[in-house]
């Protein structure tokens, strides 16, 4: 029997760590939190100094029993949950359940799950940091007080199943505020004039800049005509040449927030998926002969700090691969995390390259690991050097300007370019070699009419970035927050951008009127600052809770008395129930919209909303092929005559037969490419656009 018991959150983490520690250590998983506030009631005694009433989470009884059994037999119990506030709270709850001594140095933390890091952490165990535990407790209790007080009011006055929360309500507000900006936006006309110029055999473009040596706004066609009328022939002169060398520094290695943003832009990952895959990479990957190793550092961090060891290893790799000129000469300026002294998200070893790891990883794991690895290595590389040139092209009172740039030294851009840098302004644009006094010929002067555009709706990446910039919540809460506002049907995604629903706007208006603090950005930011102060030991958690709740409970009482009941009418489905003849209506469920009988609860008939794709079923030739959704919300295609006909296809039938085998053809999508393939043989053809 092992003398030492080590408790971690997950079986994957337990499996990895046990291999490093040897036979004297038994490592088991708590499967996440074991204690929490009860779901069936508030669980916070507001009359007794906000004392929380923790209970064992339903279903965790057998886990707790197993933990107690092993703890009783062990000489030492070590709590090795994650190195953040959440992990500290899990360790504290475990110590309470297992009745461990408060002063016992039994807490071990490591930022990466590698043999050296884990073994080193066990040489330096410490006591549980109660300030971190209290900060997490305060957040949990705050969220419970808000959710369990506002939600019942919304159920009673608006609709059952609704919720509000400190972070989700602000996120919803951002989406709605942006939608209102778009609705209220009034487009304004403006014009541009672009000229195509020739010098010897080279052609290049330039934009109109000045009239009579001053900026001249082209608001109307009349303004444009004034400029074109002033032109005299096609000859222009180069009146100024400005050459500069520009340095582009690489982006910092990833924090939780920037990882979520970049994975959304480059990999099309939702925030939740990014965190799930990152967790797998952190907890350990089986590298066969090398054993199980955590490939990245802890993925919940807001720090860009890098350890000296990691920097040295990256420098060695860059020198060997690209040469010493590609290594960074900059002094570190990494941002220390607001919450804890973590490192940035980086590979646990630069020498484990994505290509070397590919055979051990799933497709998603490989893509995310490659992103993290390249971003980190690039952050340790030399800046790129760009040569820029600006040409002023003049005729009389009219001046055009051409801007060009070439890459003199690629530096970090050899390996990685941040998505937001993939813009036209950062790409090469070569101009002919011209000097002041040279003559060029205008081959085309092209005016173009434009209208100002409203601000774009939020993508998931932009919403995450805005929440972080405003300091709303923690990066680790963004994924569940975005999930919640979608599951509650407060927002929907259209072309990968968030649009508020009618229900979302109704809920927002009620929260805005009766609980203004909850959606106030400044209030939410101040609350995060107070939570940080609790973690630093500068203020007690009970004082923070009391400062909030004393005024909040008055808002709840006012809402219960004054909020008017709102009737949300169901959308007619346009057909009658085949069971009782009542009109069918559109309802929103967990997996999207469906049809239900308006005579509910007397009639409980429901049916899926199906969309015909205009193709006859290739199996029965009687029904139509319709689009359906699986329980996991994945689109598939079936026959409208189901269950009489059981035709099903994940790919979209196109209504034509294969010229080789006469089976039906389907549209097959892989990434950004679409092609037509046979459902039976190897026939392929390009998809028609």
Swiss-Prot record:
Entry keyword annotation includes Magnesium: yes
Residues of the active site: 298
Domain Toprim: 3-113
Enzyme Commission number(s) of this protein: 5.6.2.1
Keyword Isomerase: yes
Cross-referenced Pfam families: Topoisom_bac, Toprim, Zn_ribbon_Top1
UniProt xrefs under CDD domains: TOP1Ac, TOPRIM_TopoIA_TopoI
A single MF term (Gene Ontology): DNA topoisomerase type I (single strand cut, ATP-independent) activity
Required co-factors: Mg(2+)
GO annotation terms (biological process): DNA topological change
Zinc finger (C4-type): 577-603, 617-645, 658-681
Root EC class: isomerase
Region (Interaction with DNA): 163-168
Key words of the record: DNA-binding, Isomerase, Magnesium, Metal-binding, Repeat, Topoisomerase, Zinc, Zinc-finger
GO cellular component: chromosome
Start and end residues of each stretch annotated as Disordered: 328-357
Binding residue positions for Mg(2+): 9, 82
InterPro entries in the record: Topo_IA, Topo_IA_2, Topo_IA_AS, Topo_IA_cen, Topo_IA_cen_sub1, Topo_IA_cen_sub2, Topo_IA_cen_sub3, Topo_IA_core_domain
Cited function: Releases the supercoiling and torsional tension of DNA, which is introduced during the DNA replication and transcription, by transiently cleaving and rejoining one strand of the DNA duplex. Introduces a single-strand break via transesterification at a target site in duplex DNA. The scissile phosphodiester is attacked by the catalytic tyrosine of the enzyme, resulting in the formation of a DNA-(5'-phosphotyrosyl)-enzyme intermediate and the expulsion of a 3'-OH DNA strand. The free DNA strand then undergoes passage around the unbroken strand, thus removing DNA supercoils.
Family: Belongs to the type IA topoisomerase family.
Protein name: DNA topoisomerase 1
Species for this entry: Staphylococcus aureus (strain MSSA476)
Encoding gene, per UniProt annotation: topA
